[in-house]
Amino acid sequence: TARSTTLGNKIIATSQWLQRTRRDVADWYDVPFKWDEETVRLPPDVDENAQTGNKYTPTWPSDDDRTSVPETIRAWRQYKGEHGVVGFADMLERVKQRSLLPNVEYLVIDEFQDITTLQYDVYEEWRTHMDTVYIAGDDDQVVYAWQGADPDLLLEEDVTEDVILPNSYRLPSRILNVVNREVEHIAKRQEKDLNPRKEGGRVEGVQNPSMIDLVRNVRRTV
C-alpha cells in the first residue's frame, strides 16, 4: 500500500542517514524525520506503550503490532548482505574499510558544506595521498542536513590557504540583504561581506503558506 511504501522508504532513508553520520541503529529516532506513532514503536521515553527496558532494549505488549524501526533496519541490512544489494552509503563504507584510493594527483571537492561524516572519512583517507587538494563550500548554503550533512566539517577544516570570494553571482541586493539578516544570528558561521550581483530585486512575503501554495507561487513567479 502507499502507506507501507512511505514507511518503508523512511526506514531505508533512516538506515542510510545512520550510515552517513556513523551512528548506531539505536539512534534511529534522532533522524530528522517525523514518525507516525500509530505505525511505529517510538522510544520508551516518549511511548507509553513500552513496558520495560530502555532506548536500546525496550519490550512491547504482545498485541502491539506496530513496526520496530531498529529491528527493520537490521533486517534490511542483513537482506542487503545476503542478496548483494549495495547502496551509496555502503559503497562509501567499503571505500573507507578497504582504503581504496583513486589514481589521481589532484582532489577537488565542491559543495563541501554538504558532506557527511562518512564522506569526510573517505576524504581524510584520500587527501594525504594527493599532491594538491581544493575544497569549495559555503556554510550558509547547507541543503542536505536531512541526509546528515555537517557544515562544521567545512568550518573546522585546517587549510593552507583560505580564500573568501567577494561577489555573489546569483543574488541582487534586496534579496542578499534579507538573506544576511536571516543568517547573522547564527553563532558559528564564516563571516562574509558579499557584493550583490546587481542592485534591486524583489522580495515577497507570504504568510503561512501551505507547501502546494508555495510551489504554485514559485511556479507563477518563475
What are the language-model segments listed below?
Residues 218-222:
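Conserved strand-helix element at the start of the C-terminal RecA-like helicase core
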